Design a protein with these regions (language model features):
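Conserved pre-motif I regulatory segment
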Residues: 68-107
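Walker A/P-loop
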Residues: 102-124
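Conserved Walker A/P-loop ATP-binding site and its immediately adjacent core
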Residues: 117-119, 126-150, 308-313
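Conserved interdomain hinge at the start of the Helicase C-terminal
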Residues: 124, 269-308, 315-319
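Conserved helicase ATPase core of P-loop NTP-dependent helicases/translocases
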Residues: 142, 156-166, 304, 311-358
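Conserved helix/coil segment N-terminal to the catalytic DExD/H
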Residues: 161-191, 202-207, 357
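Conserved RecA-like P-loop NTPase helicase motor core
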Residues: 179-182, 223, 331-392
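Post-DEXD/H (motif II) to motif III coupling segment of the RecA-like Helicase ATP-binding lobe
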Residues: 190-191, 198-254
Length: 392
């Protein structure tokens, strides 16, 4: 969400202020696979165009001491919410409205399974403005399309694909497709929803984030804080006020000691060849048997197995089918699966923003209640997203 400042207002002092305060340097973690540590590349959280510059909304409000975009006449849209909010979602919406009416921004800092997508659809219907949902995963984008179709009467357009309407109320837009929308059209957008916002706090994400000048912005993510501290990008755009909830659903975590310790193969740089270590680990027969034993011993549960390897996911699924255990996999280019006792997939494919109902045409409504993490997770935010798959 941006405020457009024309060239005539760009004094030398303002330019200096922008460069000083909106140039961010990501915090680097230690990477033993590199010979030397390169200096981190800075990220400029502003976008220059021929006639001016696009600046983060909240940063502009604070530094220029006024409410950005208040003078824009946004076209109204007629949208009716046909779904139904749960009791806890109604309470969340009360807080959301207060924050939006106060600052024009809110962050839904809610655990996976809270229903951030349907809340976004409700907000769009409530405020009745041309809406853009910005995301960076095609699987997530398609879930938004389905949510709007199932819970509103809105005309929805996936940017870059064929449209059924010349005048859509809602646009679902991938980060890299924002450039397909004419500037004149983007300036009419009154509500911007940023889904899985933590994934857009990058150099490549900034042009998309600042590509719109809406009246309201809704940031949605369960894990905004990033290890490189680039969540400051989102703070400069939407501020730090949020609607937050803790996970209240009880759950157990069991650490399984496999006794497996693969030999470490050293790379040319003198450090462990991590790719080979991972492969040797999942190829270990003892470890494989332990995972399959856990699944067999919990036949009364619906199990999700997450791995970092497409090859391993397919291998485990095939092994389960040989034991007459109903199973399917979702990884690589595979776009759907059949409802089964076990689903095996990769963290990259279904670890974030995954909703079974949108990927499984035979889904019977029984959620996963057992998660087997069959790989290592480096980032805490990634772990939270993965674990969140069984809180739906």
């Amino acid at each position: 969400m941006a405020y457009f400042l024309p060239n005539k207002s760009l004094s030398k002092e303002v330019v200096q202020l922008i460069e000083q305060q909106l140039t961010f340097t990501p915090v680097q973690g230690f990477n033993p696979s590199k010979w030397t540590r390169k200096e981190a590349k800075t990220i400029k959280c502003y976008t220059k165009v021929n006639d001016g510059v696009y600046l983060p909304y909240i940063w502009s409000s604070i530094n220029f001491n006024f409410c950005p975009n208040i003078d824009i006449d946004y076209p109204m849209q007629e949208m009716i919410f046909t779904g139904e909010l749960r009791e806890n979602q109604i309470a969340i919406m009360q807080e959301v409205q207060i924050q939006l009416d106060k600052t024009g921004c809110t962050t839904l800092d809610l655990p996976p399974g809270t229903g951030k997508t349907i809340l976004g659809a409700y907000i769009a219907s409530l405020y009745g403005l041309l809406t853009v949902v910005l995301c960076n995963r095609l699987t997530v984008a398609r879930q938004w399309v389905k949510t709007f179709h199932d819970n509103t009467d809105a005309s929805v357009y996936m940017v870059g694909e064929t449209s059924d309407s010349d005048t859509p109320n809602v646009l679902i837009c991938m980060q890299e497709r924002v450039c397909k929308l004419p500037r004149e059209y983007r300036e009419q957008v009154g509500l911007l929803i940023i889904d899985e916002a933590h994934t857009l706090c990058t150099e490549s994400g900034v042009p998309a984030l600042l590509g719109f000048t809406p009246k309201y912005i809704v940031v949605e993510t369960a894990t905004l804080e990033r290890d490189d501290e680039m969540h400051c990008i989102m703070h400069s755009i939407a501020g730090t006020e949020s609607v937050s909830r803790e996970i209240i659903k009880p759950f157990k975590v069991i650490k399984v000691l496999t006794g497996v310790s693969p030999d470490r193969v050293m790379g040319k740089n003198g450090y462990t060849n991590y790719v080979q270590l991972v492969k040797d680990t999942w190829q270990n027969e003892r470890r494989q048997n332990i995972i399959m034993s856990i699944i067999k011993d919990n036949a009364n549960r619906k199990t999700l197995v997450l791995s970092s390897s497409v090859e391993y996911s397919k291998l485990l699924c095939a092994s389960l089918l040989e034991l007459d255990i109903t199973a399917d996999y979702l990884c690589g280019n595979k776009k759907s699966y059949q409802d089964s006792q076990v689903l095996v997939g990769t963290t990259g494919k279904i670890g974030t923003g995954f909703d079974p109902a949108n990927f499984c045409s035979t889904y019977k409504g029984v959620p996963f209640d057992l998660l087997i993490m069959a790989c290592s997770i480096k980032k805490n935010s990634t772990l939270q997203q993965n674990v969140g798959r069984i809180f739906r």
